[in-house]
Amino acid sequence: MKNQKIRIRLKAFDHQMLDQSATKIVDTAKRTGAQVAGPVPLPTEKSIYTILRSPHVNKDSREQFEMRVHKRLIDILEPTPKTVDALMRLDLPAGVDIEIKL
């Protein structure tokens, strides 16, 4: 697997769970002999939703909710077959979305 790169993008609502998952991936890749670049923090997506508090009147009374999506990027340079096998067996939390590109 020479001259290849694995790019892993992680997304989660909870930044602590995201950082724990990123450190697990980095430790696993380094333990199997691959070079790792990252985790690189990407910009946080922030979505704000404004709704009326009452169901009928009072347009002045509103409530705002926000949803933040935190993201990290990890590049694994020159992965070995042992690295790919270890990453496939890695157990990560359910709240983290993982996108892998070769």
Curated annotation (Swiss-Prot):
Keywords: Ribonucleoprotein, Ribosomal protein
Gene3D superfamilies referenced in this protein's UniProt entry, alphabetically: Ribosomal protein S10 domain (3.30.70.600)
GO molecular function: structural constituent of ribosome; tRNA binding
Thylakoid is among the record's keywords: no
GO cellular component: ribonucleoprotein complex; ribosome
Gene Ontology BP terms: translation
The keyword Ribosomal protein is annotated on this UniProt entry: yes
PROSITE patterns: RIBOSOMAL_S10
Similarity remark: Belongs to the universal ribosomal protein uS10 family.
Function: Involved in the binding of tRNA to the ribosomes.
Subunit structure: Part of the 30S ribosomal subunit.
Protein name according to UniProt: Small ribosomal subunit protein uS10
Organism: Desulforamulus reducens (strain ATCC BAA-1160 / DSM 100696 / MI-1)
Source organism phylogeny: Bacteria, Bacillati, Bacillota, Clostridia, Eubacteriales
